[in-house]
Amino acid sequence: MVFDLAKKALAASGLRNEDQMRDYLGKLDFLVLQFSPKGARGFSLLTRAQKLFEALWKERPNRYQPQGHFRLNEVIDAQLSNKGQVVGNCLGLTILYNCLLKRIGIEGEALHLENAFGTGAHVLTVLRIDDFTIDVENILPEGFDYKGHKKDPFRLTWGDKELVADIYQSRGTELFEKGQFGEALKNYEMALKLNPRYEKAELNRAILLDRMKTEE
């Protein structure tokens, strides 16, 4: 069964209503139409990917905030907003870009780093097109074909499932901090179902379970 990144990411973001789901999938389609360059069919896949990246930054240059949106629906709304709000954090920007890439016929992956820019865990897009492997740093306006992570010894490639797992992990942490332990646990467990080797989700789940025991 095909793993639909956009649908799964929206579900992980908290959308359950089919009408809402269709609405946001339609918004993704609108963004593709908005940012697809004229004559795109004549461009190489690499050029299409670059032009999409540049168009997103041109339209919303105030894109990145470390604690910004990570839910796909919120990132989409921020991208479409005329209020100049920040679009998202590294996870949100990467999911948005990868979803749009799929809609123009390009399969992007994600790259997970344990410590990027000296600030901790980080995700970005990685493209494998023809003989090229290109990092796309979604938090930087000049981030297409970014070279700064090439020598990182802890580069870990993520597929769509692992990327969606990070949404569940982020939601779990958000709910944990709000004291909604039961819902937090569900999200950590969903993260681990999609990415059983995700140590961060496993650790946070263990911390949560210990906390729940002490408060029984």
Provide a role label for each language-model segment.
Residues 3-7, 11-81:
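Secondary-structure boundary elements
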Residues 48, 92-157:
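Hydrophobic/aromatic-rich core segments of domains that either
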Residues 164, 197-198:
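Residue-level recognition of tetratricopeptide repeat
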